[in-house]
Amino acid sequence: MRKYLTTTTAMALALGMMSTAAHADMEAARAFLDTEINGLSVLSREEQEAEMQWFIDAAQPFAGMEIKVVSETITTHEYESQVLAPAFTAITGIQVTHDLIGEGDVVEKLQTQMQSGENVYDAYVNDSDLIGTHWRYQQVRNLTDWMAGEGADVTLPTLDIDDFIGNSFTTGPDGKLYQLPDQQFANLYWFRYDWFNDEPNKADFKAKYGYDLGVPVTWSAYEDIAEFFTGREIDGKKVYGHMDYGKKDPSLGWRFTDAWLSMAGNGDKGIPNGKPVDEWGIRMEAGTCNPVGASVSRGGAANGPAAVYAIRKWDEWLRNYAPPGAASFDFYQSLPALSQGNVAQQIFWYTAFTADMVKPKSEGNNTVDDEGTPLWRMAPSPHGPYWEKGQKVGYQDVGSWTILKSTPVDRAKAAWLYAQFVVSKTVDTKKSHVGLTFIRDSTVNHESFTERAPKLGGLVEFYRSPDRVAWSPTGVNVPDYPKLAQIWWQQIGDVNSGAFTPQEAMDRLAQEMDIVMSRMQQADERANVYGGCGPRLNEERDAEYWLSQPGAPKAKLANEKPQGETVNYDELVARWQQ
């Protein structure tokens, strides 16, 4: 499979020499197609060359222009920055610098440009979690109108928006596309397929718990499996039943805002997000654009029984079933720990880790066999006792091209050309083999991924399945993602230290979100900052009033640990493939 992963030195050198001339060049395009794409595309060679010729022609007015774009540092964006950006420059004559910085820094730069009006970057790869922010502030170019109007002459005829599997996540309530997906990855369940199929393990589990060891459908089963494996000896070493992280830092925030509460069953039914209450516990009534509160006393669910249950289970499992030291790990430390090979399962695992988890044993990965085939699989996330059919069941990250209105039109056009180049049908299949962050349906179904699927632990099967729509990013109920997201890690981080109980922490979190939203309401009423779609908080009422109403917030269950339920992984995949 090396042919899918290798970026050749010859290609880099060829493009480097051509880019110094900074002129549009079909010769450079052919070199790129020969050496880098090398037939790995959903398009025929003739169609690839036609796309490249279109880019050359469309870029002519901007030849020699220098533009800057920015994204977070993940494998997909490293490939864009190091390989695709130089290729684009060589082919079009537009000099593009693609900066790689931390995810939080991307948001900070974006906020700086939104607040100052100065053009910091010509385009951003920004999480679609900010769709509610962008739709309300109206400071980003709405791409639907852009493609039909000012940007029509630089919009790729073969872009095919309907081919993007995440375009619903980047569409506002007004039906307009605000961001163009560049990479996306889901948060799924990860487990040791080999251990789950071991006959002594299966027999011992069945004898103890009364049902089959398999992929947990429910959190009850996940907890039983975590308990079962923790302390068990496999291949001469002690193993653990769970992996997670708990360090009080910003990465702990998205551990929860990335739909952990909805996995437990917090919020209402609705795809891609619950209505009227979403997974953050923020209520926004149907047919309106004004959030009315996060606290149960205002009709929200951020501190309701389902949310508190979700935080309590995170804390308990981290203490009882994870390897020593996991509670002090941050997001970035948890992956290397998993590759040691002493953990049975992880309930909250990003598919962006796939590229690292299929590395060979020689690179320190103890979760593959000697041939490099994964000993693990990924599967749908289990759900908690408050979950109901029709609710989202997990999170999907969609990093998307975002162009602000404060960027001058000519620079926006040049940046739009680059954005389309790196997601084009010519390029996307090869890019997806490098980063494994699918954005196009045509790519997911390409024959090269059918061939590679056995080496990817279930990634291809998941993205080809109809279930993928139940994993979605943060939605439009969240009026200002940067302002509200930072509250989460600061409050929940105090649970694992023992400073606050889960209920106390979520009460504080919900109250602080309401305080911040009340300030947004004042700004919107005074100066139309959110276009009239800022919060309009409900008056507080007795919590029992809201808990007795249908839907979220949901009243506390008498039994939060019903009998566990599992499913056989191979049968699950077979259902997907029918």
Model-derived regions: residue spans:
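Gram-negative bacterial Sec-dependent N-terminal signal peptides
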Residues: M1-A22
